[in-house]
């Protein structure tokens, strides 16, 4: 048994290295060329048992590809203590010692602090951590996170890595974006209606996508976090203050976003949010479950299907508007979802969301779902004004809807947040922010 466990550990470390080498050559900017570099983040704290297989895999990896092809960057906190604001180096010294004991020697130290590090602090860290003083980087507090790459470049990071920053205009474009972000004055607010609102990291990719789109339309973004269950009618009896607060937050927002999720908690609240946005011409974006609840709402309140629901929440729904996909196994739910990047083909010549994506006949986006809009009711839905403008390669599965005669009411079955980047926001998010800012689509 012990021998089997050891063999399993070896296999894991090999697979980690294989994965890194494979993804390091995948295009990351939407083009066909391989990337110049691959950044691998190993989170947590040095010495944690959870990260030990990855640290050992990286230790081996440096010899597998050659030490000249790997740079280890250690990110550490330099706390400021006492009334005089002394910068303490002991935490970083200790973590570097631990890391070197595990076989990894950092080439660069990136040190977080509230204020720029003094030369004395840098020299002390260099002496005790076995790195060049030029390789000790200060990353202090800045107005927005997009200043951080500029801060590192100014301290000579590109020179250490052997990168010619004059060979591209990307850094200058990034600099312009970072400083423009400091000057934004016009606000735009988006209501995020979800079930995990106490932990915003649950929606980190969605938040970043909203920020990317807000930068593009030159607006300061504020997110109104709304617990979906607080919008439900029964919550008025349970806690009237939370009910009123949730509805006030929704009504004060310029746009509404319902992200993906699983389970029935808060679903009726999401349906109420979709109805409010539809009836009041408020920009709306539904992602995955957000598309499904908007479809259910439309069936109930436009088509008169009072019992419409998803079979995920009611297996005996009178009108099953959203159903379990026939090819998915109900026995092994975790391994049989419709996953990964898949094409969606346009079904119309022109619509708002298609114009945002561009002129291609299809779009590739990442999926993660088990349920779909019931194909049997699509014709009824479209006749009432909700058009399924994007479908899968079979032409049967609905991927994108857009509502006629609405400023912006869009649902997507996939997860566009995973492809959004600074300077290249995801089209569905860009459309939401443009409409919420009063800009013409």
Where in the sequence are the language-model features?
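Single conserved hydrophobic/aromatic residue that forms the stacking wall/gate
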Residues: 1-7, 11
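Internal gly/pro-rich beta-alpha loop/helix module
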Residues: 24, 53, 62-63, 69-166, ...
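Glycine/threonine-rich flexible loop motifs
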Residues: 46-54, 84-85, 201-204, 261-272, ...
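Loop/turn-to-beta-strand initiation segments
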Residues: 34-38, 70-71
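Acyltransferase
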Residues: 145-207, 211-218, 222-238, 247, ...
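A short, aliphatic-rich alpha-helical micro-motif
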Residues: 4, 32, 247-252
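Short, surface-exposed connector motifs at secondary-structure boundaries
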Residues: 36, 102-109, 276-283, 361
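Cysteine-nucleophile active-site neighborhood
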Residues: 249-345, 350-352, 414-416, 422, ...
């Amino acid at each position: 048994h012990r021998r089997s466990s050891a063999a399993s550990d070896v296999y894991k470390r090999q697979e980690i290295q294989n994965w890194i080498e494979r993804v390091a050559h995948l295009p990351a900017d939407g083009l066909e060329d391989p990337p110049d570099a691959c950044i691998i983040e190993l989170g947590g704290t040095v010495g944690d048992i959870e990260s030990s297989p990855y640290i050992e895999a990286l230790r081996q990896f440096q010899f597998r590809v050659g030490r000249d092809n790997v740079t280890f960057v250690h990110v550490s906190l330099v706390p400021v203590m006492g009334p005089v604001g002394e910068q303490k180096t002991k935490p970083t010294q200790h973590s570097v010692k631990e890391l070197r004991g595990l076989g990894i020697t950092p080439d660069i130290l990136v040190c977080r602090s509230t204020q720029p590090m003094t030369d004395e602090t840098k020299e002390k860290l260099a002496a005790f951590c076995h790195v060049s003083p030029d390789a000790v980087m200060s990353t202090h507090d800045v107005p927005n996170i997009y200043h951080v790459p500029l801060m590192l470049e100014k301290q000579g990071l590109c020179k250490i890595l052997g990168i010619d920053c004059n060979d591209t205009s990307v850094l200058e474009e990034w600099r312009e974006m970072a400083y423009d972000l400091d000057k934004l004055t016009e606000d735009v607010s988006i209501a995020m209606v979800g079930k995990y609102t106490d932990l915003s990291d649950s929606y980190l990719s969605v938040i970043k996508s909203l920020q990317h789109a807000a930068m593009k339309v030159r607006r300061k973004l504020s997110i109104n976090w709304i617990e979906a269950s607080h919008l439900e009618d029964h919550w008025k009896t349970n806690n009237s203050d939370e009910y009123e607060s949730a509805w006030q937050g929704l009504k004060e927002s310029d746009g509404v976003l319902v992200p993906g999720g699983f389970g029935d908690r808060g679903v009726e609240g999401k349906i109420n949010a979709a109805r409010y946005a539809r009836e009041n011409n408020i920009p709306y974006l539904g992602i995955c479950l957000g598309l499904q609840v908007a479809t259910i709402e439309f069936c109930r309140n436009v088509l008169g299907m009072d019992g419409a629901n998803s079979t995920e929440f009611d297996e005996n729904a009178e009108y099953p508007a959203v159903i379990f996909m026939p090819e998915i196994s109900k026995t092994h739910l975790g391994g049989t979802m419709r996953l990964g990047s898949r094409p969606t083909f346009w079904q119309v010549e022109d619509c708002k969301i298609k114009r945002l994506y561009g002129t291609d006949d299809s779009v590739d986006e990442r999926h993660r779902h088990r349920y779909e809009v019931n194909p049997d009711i699509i014709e009824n839905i479209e006749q009432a004004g909700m058009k399924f403008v994007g479908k899968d390669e079979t032409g049967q599965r609905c991927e994108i809807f857009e509502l006629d005669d609405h400023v912006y009411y869009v649902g997507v079955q996939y997860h566009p947040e995973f492809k959004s980047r600074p300077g290249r926001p995801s089209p569905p998010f860009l459309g939401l922010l443009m409409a919420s800012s009063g800009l013409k689509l």
